[in-house]
Design a protein with these regions (language model features):
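Hydrophobic faces of well-ordered beta-strands that scaffold small-molecule active sites
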Residues: 3-8, 29-33, 63-67, 104-106, ...
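Active-site-proximal loop/turn and secondary-structure-junction residues that shape catalytic pockets
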Residues: 11-13, 37, 69, 108-112, ...
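Conserved, mostly hydrophobic/aromatic
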Residues: 22, 31-33, 56, 96, ...
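Surface-exposed, active-site-proximal loop segments in enzymatic domains
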Residues: 40-41, 70-87, 112-126, 170-180
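Glycine-rich anion/phosphate-binding loops
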Residues: 42-48, 78-95, 185-192
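Glycine-rich, aromatic-flanked loop segments that form ligand/cofactor-binding clefts
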Residues: 53-64, 97, 101-166
C-alpha cells in the first residue's frame, strides 16, 4: 500500500499555517486534525465535526486521521467514573466515523502530553528546534508548566496537552496519580481498549497510540510506551484494531 501524505493542522484561530498554505505542499492529500477546543472526556458533537469537515473539504483534502481524541484522566487513573468517560469516547468514535475517519490517535501519558525543556533551542544554521534536556525534569513540575504556558500567552495559542484548564489542576492531578504504578497504568490501558474494541469494529476505526514523548518517566510519573519491548506488551494486551 502506498504511503499517504497528511499534514497536521491545529484549526482556524489556533494555527498560523492555513489550509491554503498546506494546499501548496506537493503530495499532501489529507489533513490530520482535531477539535482542539474540546476537553478530555467531552463528546465531539456532529455539528462541531461538520464545521471542521466543511473547512477541510473546501480545499479538497481528506480528513481520515484525527490526532488526538484525548483520554480523560479518570480512565488513566482507573477511577469508578471512568466508565462514563469511556461511553463518551465511544460516541466520539461513532460520530467521527460518519465523516470517514479511519484512524484515531491518542496517548496514555499521565498528566502531561509531550514535554520539552526548550521550545526554541538554537541550532547551527540559525534556526530553532524543540529540545529536551533530561536533567531539567528533576525540578519543580510547576516551573515547567509555567514555561510552556508562557508561550501559550505570548503566541495566543493553546498547545495540545497543555491546556490552561489542565495546568490549573496540577497539584490535584499529581495527588490523584500518586498510587498509580506502571503495572496499574497498563491494566487501565487494557481496560480502556477492551471496552472500545466492539465500537471500533462497528465503525471500522483503528486506534493509534502515541509513544510516550519523551520515552522516560518524568516528575515521578510512570510511562508505558518507552521502547520496543513495551510496544510488544501493548500489542499483547489488545491485538484487535490497535
Amino acid at each position: 500500500m502506498p504511503m499517504k501524505m497528511g499534514w497536521r493542522w491545529y484549526g482556524e484561530g489556533n494555527d498560523p499555517i492555513t489550509l491554503n498554505d498546506i494546499k501548496q505542499i506537493p503530495g499532501v492529500t489529507s489533513i490530520v486534525w482535531a477539535l482542539h477546543n474540546k476537553m478530555p472526556g467531552e463528546i465531539w458533537e456532529i455539528d462541531e465535526i461538520q464545521k471542521v469537515a466543511d473547512q477541510i473539504h473546501a480545499y479538497g483534502f481528506d480528513m481520515d486521521v484525527v490526532e488526538s481524541v484525548n483520554v480523560h484522566d479518570d480512565i488513566k487513573i482507573g477511577l469508578p467514573t471512568r466508565d462514563q468517560y469511556i461511553e463518551n469516547y465511544k460516541q466520539c468514535i461513532r460520530n467521527l466515523s460518519k465523516f470517514g475517519v479511519k484512524v484515531i490517535c491518542y496517548n496514555f501519558m499521565p498528566i502531561f502530553d509531550w514535554t520539552r525543556t526548550d521550545l526554541f533551542h538554537p541550532v547551527g544554521d540559525g534556526s530553532t528546534a524543540l529540545f529536551y534536556e533530561k536533567d531539567k525534569i528533576k525540578g519543580d513540575y510547576k516551573a515547567m508548566a509555567e514555561y510552556i504556558m508562557s508561550f501559550t500567552e505570548k503566541y495566543n495559542m493553546t498547545f495540545p496537552g497543555w491546556e490552561p484548564e489542565r495546568m490549573a489542576k496540577l497539584d490535584e492531578l499529581f495527588k490523584a496519580y500518586a498510587p498509580v504504578t506502571k503495572e496499574k497504568l497498563w491494566e487501565n490501558l487494557k481496560y480502556f481498549l477492551e471496552a472500545l474494541m466492539p465500537t471500533c469494529r462497528e465503525c471500522d476505526i483503528k486506534m493509534a497510540i502515541h509513544m510516550d514523548d519523551p520515552p522516560w518517566d518524568i516528575f515521578g510519573l510512570p510511562r508505558l510506551l518507552v521502547d520496543e519491548p513495551s510496544i510488544e506488551i501493548g500489542r499483547a494486551s489488545c491485538r484487535e484494531r490497535v
